[in-house]
């Protein structure tokens, strides 16, 4: 909904430097994680209309909340590939050594049917704990990746996951890769941080 999708653009650019990319940021209405599903669906359809009208040959929904709310409708409406992004539950569940995975995401993503489906399919491999992270998107949008306020927010959001024994953390919002160095610092070297951005870029290839 804002600059979060740039984390995926950077991965795409690294793999496909000649690719023409149209990037649309709905900065007026961010964060989508605080919006209801119907609102996000309407905004996503409008954004896709804008991009397809300007020649987009594929749509990357570079937002977990918008993916959960809009990808089926987008695929039904447009004759171009639609690629979404969602929490990397499967690779995290297979990678964990402690058997406990933490998902850092917005409340909307954690409450979505799409996330529930992921848990049904892959949650049997590990105990998966969803942690809503209010405030983090706003910190990233403000360019505050490691200031005291961001650090305090992350410490609060990470504490229950680390206390539960999570050794694998999933970045379940496209804004959060910008906070990865701080997340890794606060979590310690024994905790693996999983970022799905690379997997999305590979699907575009």
Question: How would you name each of these model-derived features?
Answer:
Residues 1-205:
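Non-catalytic structural scaffold of enzyme domains
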């Amino acid at each position: 909904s804002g600059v979060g999708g740039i984390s995926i653009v950077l991965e795409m650019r690294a793999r496909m430097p000649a690719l023409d990319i149209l990037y649309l940021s709905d900065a007026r209405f961010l964060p989508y994680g605080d919006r209801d599903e119907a609102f996000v669906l309407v905004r996503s359809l409008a954004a896709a209309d804008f991009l397809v009208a300007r020649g987009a040959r594929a749509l990357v929904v570079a937002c977990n909340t918008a993916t959960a709310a809009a990808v089926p409708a987008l695929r039904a409406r447009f004759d171009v590939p639609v690629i979404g992004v969602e929490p990397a539950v499967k690779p995290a569940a297979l990678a964990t050594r402690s058997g406990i995975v933490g998902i850092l995401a917005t409340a909307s993503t954690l409450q979505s049917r799409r996330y529930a489906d992921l848990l049904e399919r892959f949650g049997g491999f590990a105990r998966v704990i969803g942690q809503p992270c209010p405030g983090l998107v706003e910190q990233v949008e403000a360019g505050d990746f490691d200031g005291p306020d961001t650090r305090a927010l992350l410490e609060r959001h990470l504490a229950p996951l680390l206390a539960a024994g999570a050794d694998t953390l999933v970045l379940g919002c496209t804004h959060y890769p910008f906070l990865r160095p701080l997340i890794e610092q606060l979590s310690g070297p024994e905790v693996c941080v999983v970022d799905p951005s690379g997997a999305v870029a590979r699907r575009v290839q």
